[in-house]
Amino acid sequence: MIRSPKFTSSLMAAVLAVCGVAASTSAIANEAVTVQLKWVPQAQFAGYYMAAAKGFYKDAGLDVTIKPGGPDIAPTQVLAGKQADIEVDWMPSAMASREAGVPLVNVAQVFDKSGLMLTCKKKSGVSSPKDFKGKTLGVWYGGNEYPFLNWMNKLGLKTDSDIKVLKQGFNVDPLLQDQAACISTMIYNEYWQVIDAGVKEKDLVTFFYEKEGVSTLEDGLYVLEPNLKDAAFVARMGKFLKATLKGWDAAVKDPEGAAKAVVAADTSGSSSLKVQKRQMENVAKLISNAGTKKIGYLEPAAFDRTIKVLLTGGSDPVIKKDPGKAAYTHAVWEAAQK
């Protein structure tokens, strides 16, 4: 059957219109990014939630999925399994994973100070690190144990004989119930759980890894090294980082707003504004570059210090070889400055 020219033109116009709409939609479609957090929703990750809540990701043309972590989630495994584009991790566990064969590369360092500490009851008889010998010390595992193990090696304490290591759950019960002389805490979280449980600050002794000279870099952003060969990936991560750092600046300036963003994102309903605001106020102390152009920039000297700590762990160091400059890049951070 022969179609009339008019019908053919109309049909062609319709087809072109549909194609045009499809092309236009494709052109403006947001780029997808999935970030895997190290732990459950809390102010430790307020910058990501703030960036989402304030529309910074959307404004950057991104569709960002924020995956919470948890006790049964290993962020590096999620990243290696290609279920995320980028992850939040501590440098000790990231470098240990890299040495074990997962090619992690640091692309940004949000926290430039450590919030990790051991919190002890004075009545346990601990007043200095010299008193650790013979005591039970609570330690988080799942990658969080590396700074502790390095510290004990530096003190010359064997973890299988000189002290008793309690594999600590993610609560403060061992200290409250006197099952351990000291437990692992973060200045922005578990330490305050101890206080909220009724223990007075004057009855506690705290040892900050930062002050003990054994601190390592904590919350940073990591990707898989092969992906960095893709210019489009680097550009996409640059957009993500720029929006994320904007979210962190906003969170530091507005702890209450950050707390609201975190609570809104916590589907478990366990978060409270009071607790998350306090946590954000303490997290802010770990981001000394907030509000400056240096936020998120990994200082090579800080990287070198962390690697030195990880290598000088006595007979059982966290890593056995210096990963070198290949373990970090400023390419994504530089892309975020555009």
Give the positions of each predicted feature.
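N-terminal signal peptide c-region/cleavage motif recognized by signal peptidases
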Residues: 22-25
